[in-house]
């Protein structure tokens, strides 16, 4: 028998807090501002660590993609924390709409919520393919444009941070610059500014110019690529 899952309705936009997994730290911090500007009350989750992954493994088959374990574990850990009004909380997860199993994460999450004792929690889908047509969360063209702008800003901040951080004279200077620009961009985004291509073309050089002011010592560095997320580790 098919489970009749709770739907995220348009009315919930005003009454519910939407929890969002932190899948790309810098980009998602900016995406939160875009969603808030569009009228959604949302929060990017910051809980992480091996306990989160183990909680996801408890409610999801171990053959499932590891990102699904992390995302579902992060959601369940947040709901278990007691910080949220469970009658006015919703979850948001992405759907690719392609052949990847990521399109099915939303169904795995709904099953996990029932198993964990949260059958009343609605899950909204963030996708660009017209999936979940009965959902009250709609990716409109204006919202999509705002989200894309946030991703561009986030990608640039990450690229500049990675170019500066290994050589900075003062440890943490690049990360502090990222935080300052996220706060600055956030204020602009909440005011409805910074989304257009003209505004982005104006802002990108300003960001690069400020990163260039960070004192660095350019010395040869061994380059190692680490595929890593703090959500999956103790981060020690």
Regions found by a protein language model. Give the residues of each.
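An N-terminal assembly and electron-transfer interface module characteristic of large anaerobic redox
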Residues: 1-231, 236
């Amino acid at each position: 028998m098919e489970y009749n899952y709770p739907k995220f309705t348009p009315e919930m936009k005003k009454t519910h807090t939407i929890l969002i997994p932190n899948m790309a730290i810098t980009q998602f911090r900016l995406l939160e501002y875009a969603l808030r500007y569009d009228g959604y009350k949302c929060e990017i989750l910051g809980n992480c660590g091996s306990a989160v992954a183990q909680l996801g493994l408890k409610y999801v088959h171990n053959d499932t993609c590891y990102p699904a374990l992390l995302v579902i574990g992060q959601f369940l850990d947040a709901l278990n924390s007691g910080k949220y009004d469970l009658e006015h909380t919703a979850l948001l997860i992405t759907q690719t709409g392609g052949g990847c199993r990521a399109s099915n994460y939303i169904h795995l999450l709904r099953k996990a919520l029932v198993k964990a004792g949260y059958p009343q929690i609605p899950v909204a889908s963030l996708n660009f393919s017209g999936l979940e047509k009965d959902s009250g969360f709609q990716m409109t063209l204006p919202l999509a444009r705002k989200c894309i702008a946030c991703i561009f800003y986030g990608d640039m901040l990450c690229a500049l941070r990675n170019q500066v951080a290994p050589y900075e004279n003062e440890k943490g200077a690049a990360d502090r610059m990222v935080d300052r620009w996220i706060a600055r961009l956030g204020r602009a985004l909440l005011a409805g500014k910074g989304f257009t291509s003209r505004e982005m073309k104006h802002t990108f050089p300003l960001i690069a110019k400020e990163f260039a002011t960070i004192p660095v010592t350019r010395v040869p560095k061994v380059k190692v690529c680490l595929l890593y997320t703090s959500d999956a580790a103790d981060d020690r």
